[in-house]
């Protein structure tokens, strides 16, 4: 990419900044927030957060070739220009947008946020747009899709950093795309990873109990999600038009708050209240869901291939977003009927075993509840659930999830899920205590098995023909964290290895963990 002058990066910089040396005609070849990645001609943005403070690595960045630095500390005497700002993350977002020549201003940007269902809904919208002939791209917590190219966006689930997001948007624009669906997490919003993304359409799935370890309270978590909707009013005028539309879930507890936050246009969807996009007469079976769609004067019976009644709500949100993006009604309905499953979301693993095996990403109390309710719809026999709860995260969540599982599953197996530096034994003890208080009986209706592979094996051993075994919490993720180390792990690989062992099939190996 052609270098951009440092002075040009600050031409439309919307937040206060100060420097002893005005940004001049210094060519900037790249922007980095990790000093280890810096190369000659780069701008280094020092970010404080977590266990690392980027300001401690300014000298290293300069020695690697940084020609300018942005940070929040009062620093003098550097051999390169230093620009001080109040928030380095916010600055990084605006600088990245300017570096890539503000690609979001030339695209229709559809943001999807929520606690549960946002990856599925984002993929639904993307698939409907593509099938309708819209030149669309996707940035999710699983991958970025740019034309025929699919880019992995990382091991764990969150929105990519601002430089990566703006880079993806730039590549999409260069590839001739006109629309992008951007899955947007609360961390992505709170940490300004999606600042300067110029949202045109904002969609919420739901806002329930999650990430309170980071946000502190539900209200703060909800406020972080709300930033996307508040930002609609600031979206610049675009050649493609300015929908500036909020799509809200009338059935969710977040509705009143978000409806009050949105200053412009908004539409609603739901199953429990009369809304702009309404569904009734829902039926579900292992092959998908059927419902009657009532919207825009239309009453139409719709089929979706994704199982679970919860997906009806996702369908409504996706349909509303597609219509807002200009897709004709008939094409949007046809798109719903052709949707494919999302990796790691109620994903069936089929190897000829006499029972159902599912891998799902459910890692919150509400998502686990929905996953187990869906599992109940998929079998008339028993449901056996294998899952854990992450370390160094909201501790209340692990108790709530254990309670949900002993109430909805016939057998629950508590196991590792990214314990990080927290004691796995303590996490499992908390889950077992909550399960016991909820009426569970250890050794009969629930078990503790530290090693996740062994836990999945136990689940398989306990199944009978017609049962359903579901492993929740990891979904598409490709690693698990013990201590500070990420170990390769994929629940789908582990499930296949387990089934292969049972069926006597060669060629499958269980991933190894420190607990193995």
Regions found by a protein language model. Name each.
Residues 71-74, 184, 206, 416, ...:
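Short secondary-structure boundary segments
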Residues 1-17, 40-43, 53, 123, ...:
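ATP-dependent carboxylate-amine ligase
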Residues 58-63, 173, 195, 376:
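Non-catalytic positions within long, well-ordered alpha-helices that form the structural scaffold/packing
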Residues 1-94, 98, 278-280, 299, ...:
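N-terminal leader/targeting and accessory segments in enzymes
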Residues 9, 42, 61, 95, ...:
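Residue-level signal for inorganic ion chemistry
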Residues 71-79, 198-357, 434-435, 439-440, ...:
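Acidic, Mg2+-coordinating active-site environments of NTP-dependent enzymes
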Residues 13, 92-246, 256-262, 379, ...:
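Phosphate-binding loop of NTP-binding sites
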Residues 67, 200, 410:
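Receiver (REC) domain switch/active-site residues of two-component response regulators
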């Amino acid at each position: 990419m052609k270098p951009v002058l440092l002075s040009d990066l600050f031409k439309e910089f919307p937040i206060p900044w100060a420097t002893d040396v005005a940004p001049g005609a210094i060519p900037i070849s790249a922007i980095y927030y990790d000093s280890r990645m810096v190369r000659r001609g780069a701008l280094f943005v020092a970010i404080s957060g977590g266990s690392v403070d980027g300001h401690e690595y300014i000298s290293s960045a300069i020695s690697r070739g940084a020609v300018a630095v942005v940070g929040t500390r009062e620093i003098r005497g550097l051999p390169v220009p230093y620009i001080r700002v109040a928030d380095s993350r916010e600055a990084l977002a605006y600088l990245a947008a300017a570096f890539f020549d503000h690609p979001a201003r030339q695209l229709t940007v559809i943001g999807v946020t929520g606690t549960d269902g946002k990856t599925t809904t984002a993929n639904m919208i993307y698939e409907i747009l593509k099938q309708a002939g819209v030149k669309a791209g996707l940035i999710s917590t699983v991958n970025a899709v740019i034309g025929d190219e699919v880019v992995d966006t990382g091991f764990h689930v969150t929105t990519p950093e601002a430089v990566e997001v703006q880079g993806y948007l730039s590549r999409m624009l260069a590839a001739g795309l006109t629309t992008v669906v951007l899955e947007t997490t609360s961390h992505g919003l709170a940490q300004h990873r999606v600042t300067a993304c110029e949202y045109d359409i904002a969609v919420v799935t739901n806002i329930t109990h999650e990430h309170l370890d980071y946000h502190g309270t539900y209200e703060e978590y909800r406020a972080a999600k709300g930033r996307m909707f508040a930002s609609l009013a600031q979206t610049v005028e675009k050649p493609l038009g300015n929908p500036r539309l909020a799509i809200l879930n009338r059935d969710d507890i977040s509705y009143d708050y978000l409806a009050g936050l949105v200053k412009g246009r908004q539409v609603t969807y739901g199953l429990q209240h009369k809304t702009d996009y309404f569904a009734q007469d829902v039926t579900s079976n292992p092959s998908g869901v059927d419902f009657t769609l009532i919207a825009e004067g239309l009453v139409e019976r719709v089929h979706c291939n994704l199982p679970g009644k919860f997906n009806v709500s996702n369908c409504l949100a996706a349909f509303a977003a597609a219509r807002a993006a200009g897709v004709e009604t008939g094409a949007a309905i046809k798109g719903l009927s052709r949707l494919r499953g999302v990796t790691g979301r109620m994903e069936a693993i089929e190897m000829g075993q006499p029972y159902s095996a599912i891998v799902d990403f459910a890692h919150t109390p509400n998502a686990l509840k929905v996953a187990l309710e869906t599992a109940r719809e998929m079998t008339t026999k028993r449901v056996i659930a294998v899952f854990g709860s992450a370390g160094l995260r909201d501790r209340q969540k692990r108790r709530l999830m254990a309670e949900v599982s002993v109430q909805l599953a016939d057998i629950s197996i508590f196991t590792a899920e990214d314990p990080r530096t927290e004691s796995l034994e303590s996490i499992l003890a908390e889950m077992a205590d909550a399960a016991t208080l909820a009426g569970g009986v250890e050794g009969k209706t629930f078990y503790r098995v530290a090693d996740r592979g062994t836990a999945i094996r136990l689940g398989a051993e306990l199944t009978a023909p017609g049962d359903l075994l579901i492993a929740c919490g990891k979904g598409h993720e490709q690693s698990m964290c013990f201590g500070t180390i990420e170990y390769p792990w994929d629940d789908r690989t582990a499930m296949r290895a387990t089934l292969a062992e049972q069926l006597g099939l060669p060629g499958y190996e269980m991933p190894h963990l420190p607990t193995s």
